[in-house]
């Protein structure tokens, strides 16, 4: 898993502008660049497949050629435009694209590429322990693409699950929750996006909460945790937070813990929180750049 993160970071840094030894350092990063870099580092911490490091130039050329000839991105798109787009995709996106195109299925990633990442490996072990105890978990992530990856892992491990995120039809949400909460339900896991699933839902069918990636605002994660702490819950609730050591994850958790002392009204002010997050991103990036 550590090698995966290092390879992803190296791939990311190779795409960044660099300056020769002895040259003047680059100008300070603006907010847009800081946010983009920070998001990139968060992706690496969550799962290396969220960036591109496994698909090299040869694979990119093959994928681009097939997609161009088959008009996957529109028959009017030139090969150069197709290749430019394909290069911008993450390993997971490319894996899905290859799976959709029969001629490229040989380029799909192996199961080890999904479950070998640090967080995913820890999650797989944790789920085995939870299942053995007869417990059932809610798994929250801020990223829909992370939920996509977790779906793949859960299927591979044979866990039954349901999912709810921002794209879930409003009329289906209660049906999904009812199916999970139903006494004797054989659905083991409930995947939720932190914001979409963080309010108004009663999910007392679970007694375990797993926060896959923490939010800068601790109140957001607490709202997610509260899905288990609702009227009708008769069991103790256990909360797990997955944090990748040596990454921006650790700093986010530290910042969130400091904010717990702030008034809830302040934390609910979107303008204040946006400014706080921007400041935190700058601080973290500056520390990483030394």
Q: What is the meaning of each model-derived region?
A:
Residues 1-70, 78-290:
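ASCE P-loop NTPase motor core, strongest for the SF2 helicase catalytic module
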């Amino acid at each position: 898993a550590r090698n995966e993160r290092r390879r992803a970071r190296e791939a990311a840094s190779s795409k960044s502008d660099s300056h020769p030894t002895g040259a003047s350092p680059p100008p300070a990063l603006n907010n847009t660049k800081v946010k983009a870099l920070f998001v990139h580092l968060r992706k690496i911490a969550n799962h290396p497949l969220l960036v591109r490091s496994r698909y090299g130039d040869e694979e990119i050329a093959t994928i681009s050629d097939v997609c161009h000839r088959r008009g996957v991105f529109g028959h009017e798109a030139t090969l150069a435009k197709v290749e430019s787009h394909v290069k911008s995709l993450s390993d997971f996106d490319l894996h899905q694209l290859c799976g959709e195109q029969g001629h490229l299925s040989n380029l799909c990633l192996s199961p080890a590429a999904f479950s070998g990442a640090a967080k995913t490996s820890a999650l797989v072990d944790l789920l085995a322990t939870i299942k053995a105890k007869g417990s059932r978990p809610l798994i929250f992530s801020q990223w829909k693409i992370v939920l996509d990856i977790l779906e793949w892992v859960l299927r591979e491990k044979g866990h039954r699950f349901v999912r709810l995120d921002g794209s879930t039809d409003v009329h289906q949400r209660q049906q999904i929750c009812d199916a999970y909460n139903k006494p004797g339900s054989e659905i083991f896991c409930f995947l939720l996006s932190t914001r979409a699933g963080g309010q108004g839902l009663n999910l007392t069918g679970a007694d375990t909460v797993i926060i896959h990636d923490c939010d800068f605002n601790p109140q957001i994660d607490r709202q997610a945790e509260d899905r288990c702490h609702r009227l009708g819950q008769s069991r103790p609730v256990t909360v797990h937070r997955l944090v990748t050591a040596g990454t921006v994850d650790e700093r986010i958790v530290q910042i969130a813990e400091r904010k717990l002392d702030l008034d809830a009204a302040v934390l609910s002010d979107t303008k204040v929180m946006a400014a706080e997050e921007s400041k935190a991103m700058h601080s973290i990036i500056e520390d990483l750049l030394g």
